[in-house]
């Protein structure tokens, strides 16, 4: 199943939060939507790396955004980040808010969270940074974190342990991850990425059984998801 159908992505602003493949989801979903004839603006409220083959618009001129969308179908609207993130080549929030971009592009996909490249995370009080106008939040979970010690696989392990009632040395189970997702109540739907074996898929199915939001699982790198419920 393609990503749009598996995640029920609608026109307007969609926020991508969590860990384990947010930027990959933005890139693959944008390409999929572009291939269907839609225009897509990529944005962030935190930081992300530039997208290969996608024009980056750093100004606040809406005509420049329109031109980039007309030329390539997809435009990244962001500015070079400051400090260590900028030194690493990352981009930060652009001059045009996602709600403004929604008047220019059919779809606006926003990376609204950070995870320090770890497969799992819990959220601090100020996270995620979901922008005004966002109609849904897709939470990405990295299946590679299942079975790994919480202290090694989770961004903000102390918060994770508080919500899941576990210790940093415990392994991250689907039950613990589900407890955190339920307690936070941030997700409109969940995507379990890195499901490239029966063990990972079994963990995703267990997660789905414990949640009351739709769950899809598969490989974002391959552009493949299966809707579990």
Q: What function would you assign to each model-found segment?
A:
Residues 124-146, 153-163:
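Inter-motif core of Ras-like GTPase G domains
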Residues 77-122:
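Phosphate-binding/switch loop-helix module in NTP-utilizing enzymes
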Residues 16, 40-44, 76-79, 108-112, ...:
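General beta-strand structural signal in soluble alpha/beta enzymes
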Residues 203-229:
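Canonical P-loop GTPase G-domain recognition
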Residues 2-36:
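Walker A (P-loop) phosphate-binding motif
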Residues 59-64, 152-169:
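Acidic, Ser/Thr-rich peripheral helices and adjacent loops at domain boundaries
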Residues 30-84:
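N-terminal phosphate/diphosphate-binding loop that engages ATP/GTP or pyrophosphate donors
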Residues 112-113, 142-144, 162-181, 187-200, ...:
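G-domain G4 guanine-recognition motif of GTPases
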């Amino acid at each position: 199943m393609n990503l749009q159908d598996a995640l029920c992505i609608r026109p307007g602003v969609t926020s991508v939060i969590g860990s384990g493949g947010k930027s990959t989801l933005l890139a693959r979903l944008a390409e999929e939507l572009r291939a269907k004839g839609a225009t897509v603006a990529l944005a962030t409220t935190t930081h992300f790396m530039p997208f290969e083959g996608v024009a980056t618009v750093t100004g606040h001129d809406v005509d420049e955004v329109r031109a980039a969308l007309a030329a390539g179908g997809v435009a990244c609207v962001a500015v070079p980040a400051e400090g260590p993130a900028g030194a690493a080549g990352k981009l930060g929030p652009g001059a045009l808010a996602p709600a403004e971009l929604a008047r220019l592009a059919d779809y606006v996909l926003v990376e609204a969270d950070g995870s320090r490249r770890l497969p799992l995370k819990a959220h601090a009080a100020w996270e995620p940074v979901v922008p005004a106008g966002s109609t849904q939040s897709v939470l990405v979970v990295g299946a590679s974190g299942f079975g790994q010690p919480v202290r090694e696989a989770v961004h903000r392990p102390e918060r994770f342990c508080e919500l899941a009632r576990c210790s940093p040395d415990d392994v991250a189970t689907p039950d613990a991850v589900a407890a955190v997702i339920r307690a936070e109540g941030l997700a409109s739907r969940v995507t379990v990425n890195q499901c490239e074996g029966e063990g990972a898929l079994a963990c995703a199915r267990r997660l789905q059984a414990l949640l009351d939001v739709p769950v899809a699982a598969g490989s974002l790198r391959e552009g493949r998801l299966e809707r579990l419920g």
